[in-house]
Curated annotation (Swiss-Prot):
E.C. number: 4.2.3.5
Record function comment: This reaction introduces a second double bond into the aromatic ring system.
Catalytic activity, reaction form: 5-O-(1-carboxyvinyl)-3-phosphoshikimate = chorismate + phosphate
Keywords: Amino-acid biosynthesis, Aromatic amino acid biosynthesis, FAD, Flavoprotein, FMN, Lyase, NADP
Family named by the database record: Belongs to the chorismate synthase family.
Domain of life from the UniProt record: Bacteria
Cross-referenced InterPro entries: Chorismate_synth, Chorismate_synth_AroC_sf, Chorismate_synthase_CS
EC category name: lyase
Binding site for NADP(+): R48, R54
Record text on cofactor binding: Reduced FMN (FMNH(2)).
UniProt organism field: Bordetella avium (strain 197N)
Protein name per Swiss-Prot or TrEMBL: Chorismate synthase
Length: 352
């Protein structure tokens, strides 16, 4: 009911606030016997960690994961896995000027309307800081999927604001702070972000996530379709305002003779469906595209109201991502992996 848990058989319950003592999650339903240590999880967390370039928030968090339970002698036991990440660089005083006001475009207003109170420090529960436990859980899912099925989940940025990023090579993705698959365009991205930071403003982005080498048959129609659960999970990522599978909204202009992926004895001739038909995986790569909105915490002064309903001008100080999409790629990968492992286990339970 509370909305803090993702999954049916592989369940992840997320907890914590941006400026609390710690954040973390409990992973319940991980199969026993998976080799796992903190380094497996830390590799993924380091890809998402803040303060790694001038283009992201300068909050300095080590994001060191602690495995509290569910692993013995380097192997999962099948019991709940507790993961903890301590907050070490919170600056709550940066938010004193907005404690009683609502940032335009932020969850400040809706959280207050729902709960009648809110934690203004760093956005509290609505902060993107809470994606770190998601990435930690996703690291476990990624490892199991790779070992059991050879499934690879990876992503990249395909657009930053008005700048489209042509895909060149997966090899380029880990070599720049944008997760851009094109080294030649990185200087343009850097110049754009430098100008944006000087303006005190923010921008959105588009992220692509792909899962390859998964079998056909995953997905539970009609209400737990694979693509429906993917969209559900992705919309749980802060700042996501749009999710498409395969050709997505491009399907509108395609004729059926183009959109329907023809099949030969050697396999499919295209993948407009994005690897999912009727809510079930086809064995083709699952392709997902995300639209990330601009960060709402900006230095540009904007109009809003306070808790008394009085008009105010809001300017957000502190340390914030001018484009949350820059660090969104490993988070989106984690969410896709979490959905896939859940459906893999559900399929195994029903169909063997």
């Amino acid at each position: 009911m509370s909305g803090n848990t993702l999954g049916s058989l592989f369940r992840v319950t997320n907890f914590g606030e941006s400026h609390g003592p710690a954040i973390g999650c409990v992973v319940d339903g991980c199969p026993p016997g998976l080799p796992l240590d903190a380094a497996d999880i830390q590799r993924e967390l380091d890809r998402r960690r803040p303060g790694t370039s001038r283009h992201v928030t300068q909050r300095q968090e080590a994001d060191q994961v602690e495995i509290l339970s569910g692993v013995y002698e380097g192997v999962t036991t099948g019991t709940p896995i507790g993961l903890l990440i301590r907050n070490i660089d919170a600056r709550s005083k940066d938010y004193s000027n907005i404690a009683d006001t609502f940032r335009p475009g932020h969850a400040d207003y809706s959280y207050w309307k729902k709960f009648g109170q809110r934690d203004p420090r760093g956005g509290g529960r609505s902060s993107a800081r809470l994606t770190a436990p998601t990435v930690a859980a996703g690291a476990i899912a990624k490892k199991w999927l790779a070992q059991q099925h050879g499934t690879i989940v990876r992503g990249y940025m395909s657009q930053l604001g008005p700048i489209e990023i042509p895909f060149v090579s997966w090899d380029e993705v880990p070599n720049n702070p944008f997760y851009a698959p094109n080294a030649a365009i990185v200087p343009e991205l850097e110049a754009y972000m430098d100008a944006l930071r000087r303006d005190g403003d923010s921008i959105g982005a588009r992220i692509e996530v792909v899962a390859e080498h998964l079998p056909a048959g995953w997905g539970e129609p009609i209400y737990d379709r694979l693509d429906a659960d993917i969209a559900h999970a992705m919309m749980g990522l802060n700042a996501v305002k749009g999710v498409s599978i395969g050709a997505g909204f491009g399907s509108i202009t395609q004729r059926g003779s183009e959109h329907g992926d023809e099949i030969t004895p050697d396999g499919f001739l295209s993948n407009h469906a994005g690897g999912v038909l009727g809510g079930i995986s086809t064995g083709q790569p699952v392709t997902v595209s995300l639209a990330i909105k601009p960060t709402s915490s900006i230095r540009v002064e904007r109009r809003s109201v306070n808790r008394a309903g009085e008009p105010v001008n809001v300017q957000t100080l502190g340390r914030h991502d001018p484009c949350v999409g820059i660090r969104a790629t490993p988070i989106a990968e984690a969410l896709l992996a979490l959905v896939l492992i859940d459906h893999a286990l559900r399929h195994r339970g029903q169909c063997g």
